[in-house]
Amino acid sequence: MNAITNWMNQQKLGSLLLLAVVLLVVFPLSLDAFRLNMVGKYLTYAFVALGLVMLWGHAGILSLGQGVFFGLGGYCMAMFLKLEASDPESTSIQSTPGIPDFMDWNQLTALPWWWEPFNSLAFALVAVVAVPMLLAFIIGFAMFKRRVGGVYFAIITQAVALVLTVLIIGQQGYTGGVNGITDLKTLNGWDIRTDEARMVLYYVCCALLIACVLLCRWVQSSKLGTLLLAMRDKEDRVRFSGYDVSMFKVFVFCLSAGISAIGGAMFSLQVGFMSPSFVGIVPSIEMVIYAAVGGRMSLVGAIYGALLVNFGKTYFSESAPDLWLFLMAALFIGVTMAFPNGLAGLWEEKIKPWWRSKQIERRAIREGVALAQASYPEPPPPKSGKDVGGLPGGMSGQQA
């Protein structure tokens, strides 16, 4: 609580409140159900951008494989939803009722043992966060204990994304292959395809996103966050001070993986499917772009970056379908070259100092006017004639 209070005292609560108003009030009142569901999908990518702010911006560790954790979280949720949609009554026309349709198409006759626990919603919710964080722990422990970092770590995470994509596509009978897990309909009997359900899921996504922002800010404001910053800037000094740098790196890598996985789970709920196209190298690099455009040092900026990039992608693909890829590339290159620290950096480095200088000028003008008035007071009003020399009728002493 002290960390959050300090953050409020630093006037950063206003940006989060503004974001909450935009997400919870402006968008629902101004967008139709279809567009609002699109915004909800964009916000699921913002979870990955948040994780990258913690990992890349705050700890100095660039990962080009965050799509792995986004996809794992989405697959864990999709597995539960698919099993619920594959009850024996709904799959009675299959040769093996009671299993997902893609398993029946690939001639599986029984549900694999590792699918069985996903019949439980509680297990699925735990697995959404636990499975990606476990994989992040294994990768991070293996790499950071050997002091693998920098570009080498980025390439390794990219390779992990490629390997997992190939694995998912190759095991079509167990994962749905290139099509992924589709036709997700209900959550514990609640139809998630209706406009009302999508509205509820949108608000749930917003609430989880704001909660993750507060969690990340709490970590940043704690002693652990200070050590992460020191590790980013002077890793050797932190190590010589007696701290186990590798375990701090493992922690922040697992944290970013867990946050990204929550976004993947919300994606499966709001969009209704999950496929390997969200796991590979290309989506992972796009997720880095969200943080770069919004500002890799700003939690709220990363969310705006995810919204801006995806709004731009949608707008350009609709208005200029033949040129939208070039327009998006121009947007990415232009923003990153003009504003190396993203849009949040533009605000902090240009707009805010300019606004403060204007406020100082106005204050100086007001104080100057007040000083002039104090130094040169207005002359007193002239006295009436009867008060001059104590004589009546306004007569002077000579006249008397």
Spell out what each predicted region is.
Residues M1-A400:
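Transmembrane alpha-helices and adjacent helix-loop boundaries
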